[in-house]
Amino acid sequence: MNSDDDSVFNDDLNDSEITNLIHNIPSSSSSCSSSKNKLQRNLYGEIIPEQYVEIDSSKGYTELPPTHHALNYENLSSYIYPTNFEVRDYQFNIVQRAFYDNLLVALPTGLGKTFIASTVMLNFTRWFPRGKIIFMAPTKPLVAQQIKACCGITGIPTSEVAILLDKSRRNRADIWDSKTVFFTTPQVVENDLTAGIIDPKEVVLLVIDEAHKSKGNYAYNNVVKFITRFNISFRILALTATPASDVEGVQEIIDNLSISKVEVRTEQSIDITKYMKQKKIERVTVSPSVEICELVDMLCTAIQPVLSMANERRIYDMSDPSKINAFQVIDASQRLLKNPTIPEGLKWQNYFILQILNVVGQALRRLNIYGIKSFYNYFDQKHKEFTIKFKNKKSNNQTAARFYFHDNIKLILDKCKELIADDNFLGHPKLEILINELDEFFKENEANDSRVIIFTEFRESALDIVSSIERIGSNLRPHIFIGQSKEKEKFDEEAYLSKGKKGRTKGKATKGKQNSETPERSTSRTSSEDAQIKGMNQKLQKDLIKKFKKGEYNILVATSIGEEGLDIGEVDLIVCYDSTSSPIKNIQRMGRTGRKRDGKVLLLFAGNEESKFDKAMAGYEFIQQHIMNGRLITLAQSNRIIPKSYKPIVEKKFIEIPEENTEIKAEEDEDEIIRIATSYMNNKGKKVTKSKSKSKSNSKSKKIEKRFFMPDNVTTGFQNVTSMVRKADSDKSVADKRREKDLLDKLLDSDTEDELLIQSKKSPVKENQSKRPNSEHICEEDSRQETENNSNESNGSFENENDQNKESGVSYPLSYRQTPPKLGIRRLSPQVSMNINLDAPVATEEAAPLVTGKSTSPPENVAEKRNSPILNSSNRECAPKQKTLGLKRRKANSITDQLKRHYSRVIKPNTAYRTITVSDDEKSVEDSINNQQLHKNKNLGSTSDDDDAFDEGDVFDDGMDDELALIANDKLSSFERSLSPNLPAQNNASDEVYKHEFSPGEGVLNQEQMLELYTSYFSLLDPADRVDFYDPLNFNQKPNTSINHRGRIGHSQVSRRLLQSSKFIGSVSTTTAKNIVKRYAQTYNTTNHQHNMHIVQEITNSSSK
């Protein structure tokens, strides 16, 4: 063993250290802090060099090399921070962090989230001149606001800005290729990514507005997932005022957007309090009126039997009818339907019971929070729908019938009709307090041209508020502000009864009648009433906001449409007519005031609204604090895209806004902002008139070709095998092509075996030829050499060679002298000349006798060329390529043919072969040629097909030929020798068979082994787990009272009878008991089981007596 082998076993670790390493146990000398400095060793115990650095598993990712984006290194040394506005500390800090992390920014409304995004976008345009910067907003109005803010704050040139809001634009690919900054919606980006119009590798910055929408399958998530598949070297900046109402929601946003850092500020944060305007929050708790209490009592009395039935069936737990909650009932219904253990009939009975409770829960909520009018509009529709269906036998729900036909229900509806008929009646005390607050507010702020927004959840409630203010308020100009959807169709008794009687004709006529009456009704309705029925599209919403800003309306009664996403303007008073359990909605409502001047918020509470509001806000503040402290959430990891050697230094600078950007900044209309920016985009920074833009847009554009963003140099689409082979051939070198061409030529059936042999012997020449640049040069060189040979040698060279062959007794057929043209790839036509005087003529088979006459002269254009004293290469013709007939399948010879081939290798004295003393090369060539000629002649004389002929070198030599030769010579093969070891071995070598003898006691266990086996498989039982049986022959045995009877095993029939007998023995005297047992022992028979049973039966009978 050498010194290197010795060093393997000279490990400096002891056994305990090795054990700790195997089980990954830290040693006592090392601490947890030094775990990163562990030495890595290979299988031989050697320390691995230091280039193997341990990756910190806590990171969960590998840091990648610098970004693939093109960088402007001159600008990378600094970043610009605009001083056009007040420099705020929190904005300055957030901008710096956005350069290095995927950032989620949560700021209250009005604190400059857009300024942060604009500053980051400005610097990314300086650093990454070819990168794509995308600003996404969920709605078109928000996109217009961001265009105005970004172009007006940072002065990004409009020539580099693109606005993509129309999905049907034909020149989208040209816009994506020519621009760098894009303002669009996430749906447009998602469609263009999937269509292959955008190259995701070019995206360097993604700004997401209203990031709290990044949940579920929203387009924001799909865009980020798609880009991340091809590009991880880009930054994400997510902006929102309220990330989520719970920890799970915040974590979902972080996971979907790959957020690596969160920046959260609240109104109580130290660094933003000095920038916050004063916002006064006033709470008013309203008690229900007498009318509302009476209606609640009557409704509770009517629903009590249904509620009791639900409690008995344990499908709803609440027993107080006045506290029925519709949301809890819906949750119970869903759990009921998902329960597979309940029979279907019972399941649907319980479901219909819960549906009745759901209607009552919704009615109570409307009555307690919104008033009698909202309650009546909802409950009257439900009552009318069921009663008509039940009377027409469309419904057979007896439980619902007992509720809707209850006496109190009729009293409730009649009382509501009576109250609503009064024009001065206000459905809820909230309305009275609201109108008084509005009157006082406008009186105090009459000179300030103030605005008010009132938020409510239901459209009916919004219309009720507008109607009440218009009737009672003075100098109050309210209008409803709702979404685009139409009012839900109410139950129409006439349409329902006519349905199915006369088919669709009646329905169409009724619909046409309603449409004809619509213009007459619209003239009598107010603008708010008409909007409540038809809904408000974006055009109506925009017109209303304009009128609100101008002062035509000073009060907007809005649903959730006004909570976010619209630039409504400065509002001095926010009234929350109702409150929700969502803190996001509450914060967005209150954030509409106090932006540029002080504001006020009025919260109106009724019932349990105040407790829900406090609970929601307290939970939100708790979550915000933990997010700011970095707890309760798990952040993602992101790689740097700015090289580590660069750390940009701030350069505070006043940004000069270009003229075209000033025009966008001064515009208030959102559609006009988009039109101006689009015109600059289409004309590279030059604004044009509408007529020119229309004429230009009408020009036909090229069809967009879909791009597949695969790895570089990847061919897409379907391809046949031929095209793939051709492409592979085009990538090969000339030498590889020549080698492959020669290999294919060998496989062609049109080639003769002698040509293959000669070319195989001329491999050095082929290697030199493969180094030629192309085949044309080779042909030119060959022709030049042929010309030289023709000039140096005489014209009778072929005749001289034939004379020499005659003298030596060697002659070759015509195929060796001149190869006729064949189908297939161009081949060289070699010639062979044996310039050696042999002792005797070489023998051939009978089918091919020696040719002693003159051989046919070669063609005139063929010259002789000798490269060695044995072989003379032939002239090569550069003939044009011809199509081949393809490859022929070769068949392997049978065993008989292989035997014959094997015998042909052995040269015997009685054969036609004679030993010739020549050199090794000459002998190998000669033997090969003779064997091939013999084989060819044999095939010519036989009836077998030419396909049976194949080159000997192509046959795999598995040693069978030698075995068969031994068999033919009456000799034992090695296999037979192994089966017959007693026979005398040849060459004094015999195979030894492994012998093994077994001792007589082999496989029998001794006592020690038996004990070990027993103790391995059996263990002692705990005394508490033992089961003891009573022995009737042992009179000294006492019952074990400590035994736990939980594991008792049942007795057999004989044992049970013995135990019964033992009770009798214990009751008699000792002498009598001994006699009975003695009798049993004397008469016990080991073979007669029936006799023993008889004795036991006698003892038992005697004991019973």
From Swiss-Prot:
Residues 493-534, 684-708, 758-824, 850-880, 918-953 are annotated as: Disordered. The keyword Hydrolase applies. Its EC number is 3.6.4.12. GO terms for biological process: double-strand break repair via synthesis-dependent strand annealing; interstrand cross-link repair. Residues 518-532, 764-787 have a biased composition (Basic and acidic residues). Its main location: nucleus. Residues 468-641 form the Helicase C-terminal domain. GO terms for cellular component: nucleus. This is ATP-dependent DNA helicase MPH1. It comes from Debaryomyces hansenii (strain ATCC 36239 / CBS 767 / BCRC 21394 / JCM 1990 / NBRC 0083 / IGC 2968) (Yeast). The gene is MPH1.
